[in-house]
């Protein structure tokens, strides 16, 4: 991987934050640019550092996880978000997903599973672009093979 993924962690549980930060840094793929124990600090870290990925719990003192997401949207920070929370109810998961959360994992969770979800969250846009371009090439090849003029498809 040519560039490390920048991450902000936000969790009130210091033990979890520390363990996750160490696991992320050990992979060599991630650069933890912010580590917050409350929602206000998380929102500030996000605004200042503009990470590619946010990993947070919804239960944060000061400003809850939904407030953090709203503040990031106001600050126009575009990032992927993975929520790791004991608050795992259908309505809450649905609300989180509607606010742009990529993945929602229940606590407690295995760090290896969380790392996999984080990688997927960051790479999900890239994969769909590649798939879209591959499909476009395939359709173009079939159209040319059949003999349909290029302008019918909409370009040359």
Predicted stretch roles:
Residues 3-16, 20-24:
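Conserved acidic segment of CheY-like receiver
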Residues 44, 66-78:
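Short amphipathic alpha-helix used as the core "switch/output" element in two-component signaling
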Residues 11, 57-58, 85:
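Active-site residues of response regulator receiver
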Residues 11, 29-37, 45:
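Short hydrophobic/Thr-rich beta-strand motif most characteristic of the beta2 strand and flanking loop
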Residues 67, 88-103:
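Alpha4 helix (beta4-alpha4-beta5 surface) of REC/receiver domains from two-component response regulators
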């Amino acid at each position: 991987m040519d560039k490390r993924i920048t991450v902000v962690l936000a969790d009130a549980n210091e033990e979890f934050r520390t363990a996750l930060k160490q696991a992320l840094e050990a992979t060599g793929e991630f650069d933890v640019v912010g580590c917050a124990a409350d929602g206000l600090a998380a929102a500030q870290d996000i605004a200042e550092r503009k990470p590619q990925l946010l990993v947070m719990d919804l239960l944060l003192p000061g400003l809850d996880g939904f407030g953090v997401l709203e503040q990031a949207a106001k600050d126009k920070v575009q990032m992927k978000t993975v929520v790791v929370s004991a608050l795992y109810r259908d309505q809450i998961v649905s609300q989180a997903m509607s606010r742009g959360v990529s993945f929602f994992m229940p606590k407690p969770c295995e760090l290896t599973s969380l790392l996999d979800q984080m990688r997927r969250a960051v790479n999900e846009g890239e994969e769909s672009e590649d798939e879209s371009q591959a499909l476009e090439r395939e359709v173009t090849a079939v159209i040319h093979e059949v003999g349909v003029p290029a302008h019918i498809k909409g370009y040359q």
